[in-house]
């Protein structure tokens, strides 16, 4: 998933190589502010996740690729804890520890293919827009199988190549769609990886993600560039895109619209074969 310096390699198609994203150097500074969600939105996610996770409580949860801890405390609160936020980038973990502390949360230095927890630890595991960062997704999924309890469930919240969301900013950065097609897996690819590691596919879910706040606030958050897609655009493309946004904002022509978010649910069967 990353080196000790927080360099995160994003998986890509051979025809569109993607550079590593340095979350210690670049992304951590504005990430928490740019990606912050109001409590009602966090609760909306928890309510949706609860419908697809094991019914018993408490649940031990792993937040894999937890970043600045945007969801980790909520996972502990909603499902009774403990919750483990596993994140390779030291600066992101430090931000989480400073701003997203919770008595039932532990933040751990770790990579997706080397999760620093014992076998059969978790009842539930969340990957929220982190899977595309894993350089060896097959190894990561095998490691996830190791740390899951029999009957445990995995929620993979990701963009999928065949369902790139139409974000309000998409048209201002014309190459962003192609970049995301290179960054993200397809649903059949994700399903094949998990089933090869012994998981059963439970379902694919799509939820509406509301537009947060007003458009001026959304523009200011976007300027923080806490979108990994932007790491693969040139400075000229970014400057031109933000100039187009400024013109549209002045003209009042930016459309505030919700987007659709996808996630897949997988279960580790009670008699899962050892795929390591």
Where are these regions (language model features)?
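A short SAM/SAH-binding and catalytic strip from SAM-dependent methyltransferases
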Residues: 123-136
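A short glycine-rich, Lys/Arg-flanked "PGG" loop and its adjoining helix->strand segment in the class I
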Residues: 138-150
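Short alpha-helix
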Residues: 183-197
């Amino acid at each position: 998933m990353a080196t000790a310096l927080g360099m995160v390699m994003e998986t890509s198609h051979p025809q569109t190589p993607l550079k590593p994203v340095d979350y210690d150097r670049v992304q951590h500074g504005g990430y928490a502010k740019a990606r912050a969600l109001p409590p009602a939105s966090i609760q909306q996610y928890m309510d949706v996740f609860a419908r697809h996770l094991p019914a018993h409580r408490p649940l031990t949860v792993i937040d894999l690729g937890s970043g600045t801890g945007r969801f980790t405390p909520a996972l502990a609160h909603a499902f009774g804890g403990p919750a483990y936020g596993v994140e390779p980038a030291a600066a992101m973990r430090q931000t989480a520890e400073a701003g997203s502390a919770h008595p039932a949360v532990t933040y751990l230095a770790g990579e997706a293919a080397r999760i620093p927890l014992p076998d059969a630890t978790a009842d539930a595991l969340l990957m929220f827009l982190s899977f595309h960062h894993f350089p060896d997704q097959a190894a990561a999924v095998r490691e996830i199988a190791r740390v899951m309890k029999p009957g445990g469930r995995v929620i993979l919240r990701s963009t999928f190549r065949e369902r790139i969301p139409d974000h309000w900013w998409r048209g201002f950065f014309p190459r962003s769609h192609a970049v995301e097609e290179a960054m993200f897996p397809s649903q059949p690819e994700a399903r094949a990886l998990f089933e090869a590691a012994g998981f059963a596919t439970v379902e694919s879910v799509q939820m509406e993600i509301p537009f947060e706040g007003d458009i001026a606030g959304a523009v200011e958050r976007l300027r923080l560039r806490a979108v990994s897609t932007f790491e693969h655009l040139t400075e000229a493309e970014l400057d031109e895109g933000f100039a187009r946004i400024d013109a549209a904002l002045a003209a009042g022509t930016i459309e505030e619209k919700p987007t659709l978010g996808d996630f897949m649910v997988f279960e580790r069967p009670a008699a899962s074969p050892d795929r390591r």
